[in-house]
C-alpha cells in the first residue's frame, strides 16, 4: 500500500536482487529493490502500464470531501488539502504491478549489505532540483526525516521507529542507520516519504498555512479557494520528467480537487461537469443513477477496474478503551446485530461482498481451518488467548447471516443471549451492564454518506435494548475526536497492500493503542497479535509473509474487534469521456497518474457543457 492519507504501503524486504549472485556478502549498489518481490522493470524504458507518447495537456478534476486549512499533511495540527503528494518526490517509487518493488526517483541508486540490514545509503540524483532550481541534497533528506520523526503524526513516528540515526556522508549520499537488522522492510520504508527543502522545514514545517513546503515534484500549487477547491499545475521544468517511472506519467496540465460536504451534492456536481472523474462508491448510483442527459448523449463512461490488492476492511470499530467493549461476548453480539444481507439487497442492489477477512480477495486471506504451517505458528500462542478467541482461531470463519427479510430475528436472539451470558440484564425494556449502568452506545460519524447504512444498525441495537445514538459532527470536530480516540463506535477503513509488514503494528499493536493520533483506532492490546505482527515485519520470504498474514487475519477476526461491513474486489469509476488510459492497467491500482486527455473529446465535452 502506498503512503496515504491515507494509509501506508507495507514494505517488504528480505531484499532479492535477481541479477546479484546470492553468494556475494559485501555491500552492493543497485537501482532497484524488491523485498520478496520481483524486479521485472530494471532495464525497461517505461512502465508497461504507461503510454510514453501520451499527449500532455487538459485538466483532471476530482472530488474531495469536507474542508481544509493547511498544505502540510505531515504535521499534527490542521486539516491538509487533498493532493499534496503531487508537490513532492520520494527517494524511490513503487511498481504498480509487483507486490513491493522500488525504482529510482529522487535517489538514482542505493547501497546496502544483504547480510547486515541495519543500514542503507540512498544516493540523491545530482540532477534533482526543487521548484526554485536549487539542488536536492542529502541535507534536505535528513532535515525531512528529522522533522517527521520529531513533529509528525504519531502513527508515522511509530512506523519509522526503527530509525536510529541519519548521517550525511556527502552532498549526494545519506545513510540511514537502524536500531537492529531485524526489521528488513525499513530499508525500503525510508524511500517512500516526500522530501522537502531544508530551508522550508526550518521556518514553516509546523505552520498552519496554505503555502506548501518547497518541493521537487511534478506539480506546483495552483489556485486555492480556501476550503472549497485546490488545483495543482504541472511544472514544465520538472527535473524528473524523463525518469523511467515518469515516462508517460503526469500528463495533465492541471489537477483539480473540488470539495463537497456530502456525496449527494458531489454526485450532482459530477452530473453538471464541476468535476469530471469520479470514484463511484455508492451502489445505488452505480445501479440506477447514471441515466442523466450526458450519459444518454454518450459523454459519460462507466468502467469497473479489477484489482489484485486486498479489499480494504471497512468496519464499525469498537473502542476497546471503553469498559463496555472489554468482554468479547459483547463484541460478538454487536457483530450479530448487523444485517448485511438485508442491506446488500435493499440499499446496495446486491453489488457488495461481506468482508470475511482483513485481507479479503487476496492470497493473504485466511480460509478454512488453519494449515499445518499456520498451526506451527499458532500452537505455542494459543494458551495466551481467551477461550472464545482461541476457539474461533481454530475453526472455519463465518460471519452471521440472515435471510434478508429485514427482521434478523435469529441473529438478534443469539446476540441477546450473548449479552445475558455476559451479565447484562433487562429492566423495563432497557438493557443494563453488570455494574448497573445503562448500556449506551454512541456511533460517531461525519458527513451524510454513512447515515443510511448506520441508521438500520442503530435500530437493531435499540431492539437489543441499547440506548444507541448516531452522532454526526463536522469535519474538524470529527478529526479531533478520532485523534483523541473519543468515541464508542466509528466506521474506519484499514487498507492493505499485497506486502503487509511493520505498519501492522501501528494498526493493531499494543504500543500504538495509547498514542493519540495513532492508527490503532480499536485500541487492541493483545500480546499474541503483537508477537505475530513482529514476526510478519521480520519475514524473510514471500511464503513467510503469506503465512504470518494469514495467522494475523485469524487472530483479528476471532477477536471480534469490529463489525465488518462490505466491500468489493474492483473499483467502479465514471468519467466524462475525455480521459484515456492504456489498454492494460496495472494489477494493483487505477493508476490515474498515467491517464491522459483526448483533446478532441475534451472539446466535445466542453461544448456540451456550454449548452
Identify the role of each PLM range.
Residues 125, 207, 240-291, 332, ...:
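Ligand-site clamp/hinge motif
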Residues 123, 157-202, 206-207, 216-225, ...:
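Surface-exposed binding/hinge segments that line
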Residues 67, 78, 87-98, 190-249, ...:
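Gly/Pro-rich hinge or "lid" segments in bacterial periplasmic/extracellular proteins
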Residues 26-115, 123, 146, 214:
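N-terminal lobe/hinge region of extracytoplasmic solute-binding protein
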Residues 106-108, 113-115, 131, 136, ...:
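Aromatic-rich, solvent-exposed beta-strand/loop patch
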Residues 26-27, 31, 64, 82, ...:
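Detector for C-terminal structural segments
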